[in-house]
A protein has these predicted regions:
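Helix-loop boundary and gating motifs at the non-cytosolic
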Residues: 2-58, 215-216, 220, 224-239
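Loop-to-transmembrane helix entry/capping segments in MFS-fold secondary transporters
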Residues: 44-45, 134-143, 247-248, 332-342
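Helix-to-loop junctions at the C-terminal end of transmembrane segments
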Residues: 60-74, 163, 264-276, 361-362
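Helix-loop junctions at membrane interfaces in 12-TM secondary transporters
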Residues: 96-109, 296-308
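A late C-terminal transmembrane helix in Major Facilitator Superfamily
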Residues: 333-362
Length: 395
């Protein structure tokens, strides 16, 4: 068995591979499934409802975290393996289900794959908290999110090619088998289980969320990702409607953005360990605000691509820094629960940004929408100012 303490860089490979599998599922769910449904004659309205149903487990992520923490005496690795098996198995099963004929079974197993993803996600986060410290959490989070971005890019390009050449069913099968292979790394890794009995969860959760910094980090989590959510929806529309780019050109620019985000997560994750969380986030948020405003004056695809790639680089950076801050302020005994609560606040901000952005474009146009997306970093910077990391945390 491999001991994480003895092989210095193995933990980065382990956690990046686990997040790579999540990136593959995101490519399947957000790229392949919608296109597959179009091919099957299923309307966009039904498609969005099905994807929304499948994503329901992610909205109550803290419940899955609570389950993992309640059974802390079993360790984190068992739940990671359970998540991988559930995720992989569900994707393999939907290979044999035609949604135009059996939409409900297809939806059920797609939802089951997301359940596996969430189990994998909260368990991997908790394990990372257990085996990391403030000196390397930026690098660990950077490697995790880089793995996720690479998984999304790989899934969109490679699985998209497979779907085009041999059909969507084969692409789902290959995605499931790829994810199943990832189970090898956690199986080979030795886990040190420090708590040998079940624990009472609620008193610890209440105690943690009475703390001022915990409340402020929750607020920061919400504000930090609103702009990101807005850009996810608005950018493809901007490229198609304003810059007159076709689907292939939009896909290429999005791929460049994804690769830039992966690089940013790795480099900026290391920088946040060196500079400290607050200083790094001031820089990442501040420059992101300026660059988002810069989109307003963009009138060519080349200038836009450069600005958008830089925004992606910084998005990867502040994602790594914010999640490192989550870990710094999380009690390891309720690591899965507290981290997933922070993440739920982040998902709320992300989803809120996605939800309102289309309406903002319709009502006010692209320029004002980009201005508002940039402005969303202002409350994040204000909340960050009031976070007073205690001695032992990165400042």
């Amino acid at each position: 068995m491999i001991e994480l303490e003895k092989i210095k860089y193995f933990k980065y490979l382990l956690f990046s591979s686990l997040y790579f599998s999540q990136g593959l599922l995101m490519a399947v769910g957000f790229v392949l499934v919608p296109l597959y449904f179009v091919e099957q004659g299923i309307s966009p309205a039904i498609t969005s409802i099905i994807i929304g149903i499948a994503l329901l487990p992610s909205i109550i992520k803290f419940i899955w975290g609570g389950i993992v923490d309640y059974f802390i005496h079993l360790g984190r690795k068992k739940f990671i393996i359970l998540g991988v098996m559930l995720l992989s198995g569900s994707l393999i099963i939907i290979t044999f289900i035609q949604p135009s004929v059996a939409l409900i079974p297809f939806t059920f197993f797609l939802l089951l794959s997301v359940c596996g993803w969430i189990f994998l996600d909260v368990s991997a986060d908790a394990w990372a908290i257990d085996v990391s410290n403030e000196e390397n959490r930026g690098k660990i989070n950077g490697s995790m999110h880089a793995g996720q971005y690479i998984g999304m890019a790989f899934g969109s390009l490679f699985l998209g090619f497979i779907a085009k050449e041999w059909g969507y069913n084969i692409s789902f099968l290959i995605a499931g088998l790829f994810i199943l292979l990832i189970i090898v790394l956690p199986l080979l890794t030795k886990e040190s289980i420090k708590t040998k009995k079940r624990q009472k969860m609620m008193p610890k959760i209440i105690e943690e969320f009475k703390k001022k910094d915990t409340k402020l980090v929750s607020a920061l989590s919400t504000f930090a990702f609103i702009s990101r959510g807005m850009l996810i929806v608005v950018i493809p529309l901007f490229l198609n409607i304003y810059l007159k780019l076709d689907v292939a050109q939009v896909g290429l620019i999005v791929a460049i953005f994804t690769i830039s985000s992966a690089i940013g997560a790795l480099i900026c994750g290391a920088l946040t360990d060196k500079w400290g969380r607050k200083k790094a986030l001031y820089i990442f948020f501040g420059i992101s605000l300026i660059l988002t405003l810069g989109i307003i004056i963009t009138n060519t695809w080349l200038i836009f691509t450069i600005i958008y790639a830089l925004i992606g680089f910084l998005q990867g950076g502040y994602l790594a820094a914010v999640t490192a801050l989550y870990m710094d302020t999380t009690d390891p005994k309720i690591g899965a629960t507290q981290f997933s609560i922070y993440s739920s606040f982040g998902n709320f901000g992300l989803t809120g940004g996605q939800t309102v952005s289309g309406s903002l474009v319709t009502l006010f146009g692209f320029s004002l929408t980009f201005f508002l997306a940039a402005l969303m970093f202002a409350p994040a910077l204000i909340v960050l100012y009031f976070i007073n990391l205690k001695k032992g945390n990165k400042k």
